[in-house]
Amino acid sequence: MPYPLQLGLQDATSPIMEELTHFHDHTLMIVFLISSLVLYIISSMLTTKLTHTSTMDAQEVETIWTILPAMILILIALPSLRILYMMDEINDPSLTVKTMGHQWYWSYEYTDYEDLTFDSYMIPTNDLEPGQLRLLEVDNRVVLPMEMPIRMLISSEDVLHSWAIPSMGLKTDAIPGRLNQATLMSSRPGLFYGQCSEICGSNHSFMPIVLELVPLKYFEDWSASLL
């Protein structure tokens, strides 16, 4: 859950987001070391009075500054590719949910169930109950079972949208005429918020997403009550 003046990422809710957080820290450490080295070299050049006017080339130095950046790029690329393939891999999902973007709301269809569909609109500020979040609450939450692999099929009925849940490391474009998919699995129960992350018109800011992750027994009771 985000909070005011937050500096870091949201707490990870899914295994994918945990991997992305580790990769972020790994990359940031490399960037910090490179920046420190560059600043040290610049400060040394500005403060020293020694010069090398007779130096025309330095093969050893040129070899080092060619090989070293290549090794650094490999250190960044390998974990990045691993996470990329993890995000794209969907093996035997326990549940499939199809979500369609509209101007300016989301509709959901649980394809494993017959006639389990609904639209999800933002609750206007004047209708909020005490404790509810402004611009983030919806009239129909997406209830899903926790600790189970879920496949999300994402598309759009009109213009470009983007279905994003930051705490789960999810951001998938909703493109008219194209069906994109994403893997979702929560390691803990709770409410998780997201928003449309593609400018889609005048009410783009009013397309929140709310996932309610619950134990399997509660999900079965909820789905049975709607059928």
From Swiss-Prot:
Binding site for Cu cation A2: 196, 198, 200, 204
GO cellular component terms listed in the entry, alphabetical order: mitochondrial inner membrane; respiratory chain complex IV
Keywords: Copper, Electron transport, Magnesium, Membrane, Metal-binding, Mitochondrion, Mitochondrion inner membrane, Phosphoprotein, Respiratory chain, Translocase, Transmembrane, Transmembrane helix, Transport
Residue ranges that the UniProt entry lists as topological domain Mitochondrial intermembrane: 1-14, 88-227
Annotated residues for binding of Cu cation A1: 161, 196, 200, 207
GO annotation (BP), single: ATP synthesis coupled electron transport
Cofactor note: Binds a dinuclear copper A center per subunit.
Listed transmembrane segments: 15-45, 60-87
Keyword hit for Cytoplasm: no
Location(s), subcellular: Mitochondrion inner membrane
Superkingdom to which the source organism belongs: Eukaryota
Mitochondrial matrix topological domain: 46-59
Needed cofactors: Cu cation
Catalytic reaction equation(s): 4 Fe(II)-[cytochrome c] + O2 + 8 H(+)(in) = 4 Fe(III)-[cytochrome c] + 2 H2O + 4 H(+)(out)
Similarity comment: family membership: Belongs to the cytochrome c oxidase subunit 2 family.
SUBUNIT field: Component of the cytochrome c oxidase (complex IV, CIV), a multisubunit enzyme composed of 14 subunits. The complex is composed of a catalytic core of 3 subunits MT-CO1, MT-CO2 and MT-CO3, encoded in the mitochondrial DNA, and 11 supernumerary subunits COX4I, COX5A, COX5B, COX6A, COX6B, COX6C, COX7A, COX7B, COX7C, COX8 and NDUFA4, which are encoded in the nuclear genome.
Name of the protein in its database record: Cytochrome c oxidase subunit 2
Species this protein is from: Dugong dugon (Dugong)
Organism lineage: Eukaryota, Metazoa, Chordata, Craniata, Vertebrata
